């Protein structure tokens, strides 16, 4: 059975020692879905939101969040990310925005939390910028899509 890596033999939370691990190329992709009204999505897509470019702001927020994950999530290592990408895709038929993030580095620990944080904060930024026009926006399906590198190998999430 696999054990929790952040719990020591006394049952206490601690930061994992990665000093003996080999550096490998590591990559992770994550996504979040933001559901809103047709009117709110149209306002964003048509560039008519009074706060400015919602997608550009959410993209930058997601990138910044990935870089600061270690400050937000206890026990995460500070990482020297080599790439962070955040893409936002309006899904007009379902009144949703699909956010997908990619994080990459060559290092001793994975970038799953950075990718998940990027997608999550981009989604939260959309909510923040749009809450004045719609309070019941829903953020859902935040999940890891894929990870590679490291001893646990390659993971690809099942399609939803």
UniProtKB/Swiss-Prot annotation:
Q: Where does substrate bind?
A: 75-77, 113-114
Q: Which reaction does it catalyse?
A: (8S)-3',8-cyclo-7,8-dihydroguanosine 5'-triphosphate = cyclic pyranopterin phosphate + diphosphate
Gene Ontology molecular function? cyclic pyranopterin monophosphate synthase activity
Keywords from the UniProt entry: Lyase, Molybdenum cofactor biosynthesis
What Pfam families does this protein's entry cite?
MoaC
User: Per its record, how is this protein called by name?
Assistant: Cyclic pyranopterin monophosphate synthase
So what EC number does this one have? 4.6.1.17
**InterPro entries assigned:** MoaC, MoaC_bact/euk, MoaC_sf, MoCo_biosynth_MoaA/MoaC, Mopterin_CF_biosynth-C_dom
